Amino acid sequence: MKKTPFLTLEKAREITAQIPTPFHIYDEAGIRANARALKEAFSWNRGYREYFAVKATPNPYILKILNEEGCGCDCASYTELVLAEAVGITGHDVMFSSNVTPELDMKKAVEMGAYINLDDSTHVEFLERVAEGKVPQTVCLRYNPGGSFSLGNTIMDMPRDAKYGMTEDQMAGAINRLMKLGTKHFGIHAFLASNTTTNEYYPELAANLFRLAVRLRNATGAHIAFVNLSGGIGVDYRPEQPCCDIRIIGEGVRQRYEQILVPQGMDDISIFTELGRFMLAPYGHLVSTVLHQKHIYREYVGLDACAADLMRPAMYGAYHHITVLGKEDAILDHVYDVTGGLCENNDKFAIERSLPEIDIGDILVIHDTGAHGHSMGYNYNGKLRSAEVLLKQDGSFQLIRRAETPADYFATFDCTEFRFNV
């Protein structure tokens, strides 16, 4: 199956006349349509809510778009909370899912009235202290089942090796302590696998959490108000990969809900999700220009973007599809390593990739960078983080984050006697 960019060469040239490459660009129309499809897939649950994983794409314009489509924010740090607050997203529109949580972060979440998702049973007392004895009426607890998590005969991940969450006994103990402190309602949460491309992950996770909800209710008498399925739904980074069908996924969760919760009289439980990759990855491109070519033992194409703009290929060996704009239908009769300019040999967007013949000055689109793209950027080698651009529904574009400048890079030396001529 062919991957088609949402950006044309004509539009790219229009944008680059004002905003130089490299930059990340996001497709507003695609983001909105996908958010609506997700909401429709879970419309059978009257309390359903998506809490977008801010870590995936922490830009206020993106959060505003998703909030307009009914999404809240899943925040994991003080700065992510501040970002959500700046957009006007507060209270129970925020899920605070953190681990090894600093007091400043917890205090901010409490002040904002966010749902607090506790990662450890000892955080009950931590929350009580930070909240000055006034614990929230609703608290969420993160579950770690241990062992391995499998779908059929396929092991998806190893929860026993994960630093996150509590055992079931710890959750029951935490619920009992929280009820004594005044908490009335509880949520349960788990994240057991990442970037799954099967329609069975969410339904299987849901079944596990629904059964857990029943056991915890029976053991403690607590009211379980919501089940948070977290993230984990993946995208088809490779053209030949299967693509998740959110309608099938939503129906699978509904069936488990009807089978497990309804007979137990627990049909008031809301379903929450914390998707990031699924919400944004396909609707973002990294746009870059070819600077150089090199012909040694391999053929190299050097871009003005590097791993500082997109870390996933260097960090994980992740595949990201590449389109040469204006050559979408050309024969893929050349083999290139597509690289950036970092002083690291893993700074490669593609290794021995079949592509059309590439010329210096060509504009390349690196697909599926809408999540964990710009957000994982860094300044190694003194590289400056790129701009972010929004391709709006009417075809116009807007700069939604400027590129860093050398002045930005040196700004934190303002406590020193050194001066930098930039």
Located regions from the model:
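Charged (often Lys/Glu-rich) extended helix/loop segments that serve as interaction or gating elements
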Residues: 9, 261, 266-422
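Short acidic, glycine/serine/threonine-rich loops at helix termini
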Residues: 63, 86, 106-110, 127-130, ...
